[in-house]
């Protein structure tokens, strides 16, 4: 019995890999990471340029924002153009919202005078036109992760209002108000499942996880973080610990560190720099997807290899070139 085909995006400039028979399906997990998650756009461009379309997407925080737009049928290039226009205008609304006011509001927390942002209202301002209002209207099935503050567990959305689910997933404490859904106070999904590839088990043949978390990069001017950096980095330290523990027991087939860990989580104004930094990883992802999907049938691909540490010194033709080389070809058994 043949496997279902991947659908091809019409904006691809080359023959779609999904036009081949028995092409395995792909589940795509987009992790949380603040501004670093703008790199998701570049990774989605890799899919579009190959003519591939994920069978299902799971997203957390900024991964939920980007994932909701893409699952609505908005091509990655359109997302790139929209995001650049939104964040690079000199006097644009988002420069005020994301570059200045969060820090002022953080200071207000300590004086009791802070009023936090409404995540749904912010989404209404920043989301591109064409994002589906309801999960049922999405082109690609989507799972969005938020965190239940009081029950201290993940809340996964697969139905209902898309904007409400995304708002809950991105409601980072100290910046956004919790989003109340069915009498539950929901906050940033990264606090319970920052890289939700495990939600895709059984939904697709190959699971690809895009990790945009990364570790803090030391400032050469001082040997300790600023107060704001420490506040946010502490949350991401916790999230990276969750991911590491998950990887010990359950791994995606392709784990992609996006290469943007040296950016701060509020560096949204550096959108061009972040996208440029993600470009080499995008090309490696394209090469890996082409290699995997060029085999005739899925059984010719070995089970996922153990997680590997990327190495700048690894030979160019190495069969194990790091986290992007977790699968290798297996010659068919003709006996």
Where do the PLM segments sit?
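Patatin-like phospholipase
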Residues: 1-60, 68-335
């Amino acid at each position: 019995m043949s496997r279902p085909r991947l659908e091809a995006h019409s904006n691809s400039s080359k023959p779609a890999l999904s036009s081949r028979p028995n092409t395995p399906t792909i589940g795509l997990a987009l992790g949380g990471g603040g501004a670093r998650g703008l790199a998701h756009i570049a990774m989605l461009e890799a899919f579009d340029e190959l003519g591939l379309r994920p069978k299902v997407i799971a997203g957390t925080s900024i991964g939920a924002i980007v994932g909701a737009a893409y699952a609505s049928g908005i091509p990655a290039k359109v997302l790139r153009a929209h995001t650049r226009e939104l964040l690079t205008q000199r006097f644009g609304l988002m420069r005020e919202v994301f570059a200045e006011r969060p820090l002022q509001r953080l200071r207000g927390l300590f004086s009791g005078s802070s009023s936090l942002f409404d995540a749904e209202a912010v989404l209404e301002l920043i989301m591109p036109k064409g994002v589906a209002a309801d999960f049922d209207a999405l082109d690609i099935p989507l799972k969005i992760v938020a965190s239940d503050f009081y029950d201290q567990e993940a809340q996964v959305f697969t139905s209902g209002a898309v904007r409400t689910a995304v708002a809950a997933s991105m409601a980072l404490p100290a910046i956004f108000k919790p989003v109340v859904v069915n009498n539950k106070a929901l906050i940033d999904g990264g606090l319970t499942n920052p890289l939700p590839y495990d939600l895709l088990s059984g939904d697709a043949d190959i699971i690809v996880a895009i990790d945009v978390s990364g570790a803090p990069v030391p400032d050469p001017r001082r040997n300790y973080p600023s107060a704001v950096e420490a506040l946010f980095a502490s949350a991401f330290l916790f999230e990276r610990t969750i991911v590491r523990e998950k990887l010990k027991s359950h791994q995606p087939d392709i784990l992609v560190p996006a290469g943007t860990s040296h950016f701060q989580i509020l560096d949204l104004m550096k959108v061009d720099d972040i996208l440029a930094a993600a470009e080499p990883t995008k090309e490696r992802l394209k090469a890996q997807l082409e290699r995997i999907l060029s085999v005739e049938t899925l059984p010719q691909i070995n089970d996922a290899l153990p997680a590997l540490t990327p190495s700048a010194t690894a030979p160019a033709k190495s069969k194990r070139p790091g986290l992007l080389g977790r699968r290798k070809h297996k010659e068919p058994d003709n006996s």
